[in-house]
Amino acid sequence: MALCKAEVKKVADELGRPLTFNVQTFGCQMNAKDSEKLAGILETIGYVESDSEEADFVVYNTCTVRENANTRVYGRIGFLGNLKKKNPHMRIALCGCMMQESHVVEKIKKSYRFVDIVFGTHNIFKLAELIYARHTTKKMVIDIWKETDKIVEELPSEQKYKFKAGVNIMYGCNNFCSYCIVPYVRGRERSRNPEDIIKEIKQLVSKGVVEVMLLGQNVNSYGKTLDEPVSFAQLLQMVEQVEGLKRIRFMTPHPKDLSNDVIEVMKNSKKICNHIHLPVQSGSTELLMKMNRKYTKEDYLNLVDRIKMAMPNISLTTDIIVGFPGETEEDFLDTLDVVRKVGYDSAYTFIYSKRSGTPAATMENQIPEEVANERFQRLLTTIRESSSKISKDDEGKIAEVLVEEVNEQDNSLMTGRLSNNVLVHFKGTKELIGNIVSVKLSECKGFYYMGEMMED
């Protein structure tokens, strides 16, 4: 890192100004956390962050969960190429899940020769080394690791928020759902040592963080790869003991692995937020088998019953795919049945799209677009009906809200988040950001509330 830092300083001195950087994040919260580390490394070697993609060093941290995500990135890379013509000092780096696919790297080499650095998901800690290699060789640097069992600790990180932070507890995925590319680009499951996780959280709290989001592709698998196994329930109990930490969230649990121990820990916790994101994907047992989800409709509903028995007011959200290959009207009605029985606060809904490299992409009986679209609209209607009934129940109540930002549409309002992950907008000032305040939930607006802050 020292060699790269010296090289960056040399160029900055020649230009008579600091070199700037910009990191653009595509995709999930795992990518967002990786981008914070990339920003931390760039600041450590002497770059200064910029909001503009006209910066001297631009990083695209890519997502490849859907084919259109790739298309979007290719378009943006072309835009960067035009910017680079105007700025000979500009450097472009591409990383993330998309770069783990060999055909993507080949396309970058042939069609986007102005790109300087290409690396993947397993070696972001090498960014400074790769930058130095580009400075010295004057050629495109490509460094893709297909697999790794390495977890590098103590990387510098530049948090997006001062009051909340994501904390990786594990990397990779072993589930191989038939529609999903993630295990192929993120690798097999690897868990961080609990001591390293707790150390990071304590450091974050010392800097003012009051809420952490524990991150993993399947957090319920945490600890299985450790020399001395630790369960996710045990880790939650350890995190609960961190003084000064006020809220704990986690994402994402897999329904097949969410244990009674985790439910019990949540029930007794004073810090774990009243929310579980529990992806169902489909309500049809037959489709769940094709998806390789490893649970049935009945298994899922029984799990929801156990959760609600322990925590009657729990907020549940989910992911649902419509139009998976072979989906019949009966299969779809099973999905609507689950939505009605569970009563989700909200749902991330998707029309299935082929993802090359996954088993589902070659399955027979792909669903016609018009059929999938019609079912999608019926699903949205059912979810809205369900969520509005649930949200209305909390109108008039007073709840604790973590204030996150000035409202984007009206700067006289602040936007905060309830324990159940629902947004609340209310009159206030930016000095409240990062504080937990009491707010009366005056009016439900569907997926958010208008509120009134209560005076002490």
From Swiss-Prot:
Residues 19-136 form the MTTase N-terminal domain. Signal peptide: none annotated. One of its GO terms (molecular function) is 4 iron, 4 sulfur cluster binding. It is an enzyme of class 2 (transferase). InterPro entries: Elp3/MiaA/NifB-like_rSAM (IPR006638), Methylthiotransferase (IPR005839), Methylthiotransferase_CS (IPR020612), Methylthiotransferase_N (IPR013848), Methylthiotransferase_N_sf (IPR038135), MiaB_methiolase (IPR006463), rSAM (IPR007197), rSAM_horseshoe (IPR023404). [4Fe-4S] cluster 2 binds at residues 173, 177, 180. [4Fe-4S] cluster 1 binds at residues 28, 63, 97. PROSITE patterns: MTTASE_N, MTTASE_RADICAL, RADICAL_SAM, TRAM. Residues 159-389 form the Radical SAM core domain. It catalyses: N(6)-dimethylallyladenosine(37) in tRNA + (sulfur carrier)-SH + AH2 + 2 S-adenosyl-L-methionine = 2-methylsulfanyl-N(6)-dimethylallyladenosine(37) in tRNA + (sulfur carrier)-H + 5'-deoxyadenosine + L-methionine + A + S-adenosyl-L-homocysteine + 2 H(+). Monomer. Catalyzes the methylthiolation of N6-(dimethylallyl)adenosine (i(6)A), leading to the formation of 2-methylthio-N6-(dimethylallyl)adenosine (ms(2)i(6)A) at position 37 in tRNAs that read codons beginning with uridine. This is tRNA-2-methylthio-N(6)-dimethylallyladenosine synthase. It comes from Lachnoclostridium phytofermentans (strain ATCC 700394 / DSM 18823 / ISDg) (Clostridium phytofermentans). The lineage of its organism: Bacteria, Bacillati, Bacillota, Clostridia, Lachnospirales. The gene is miaB.
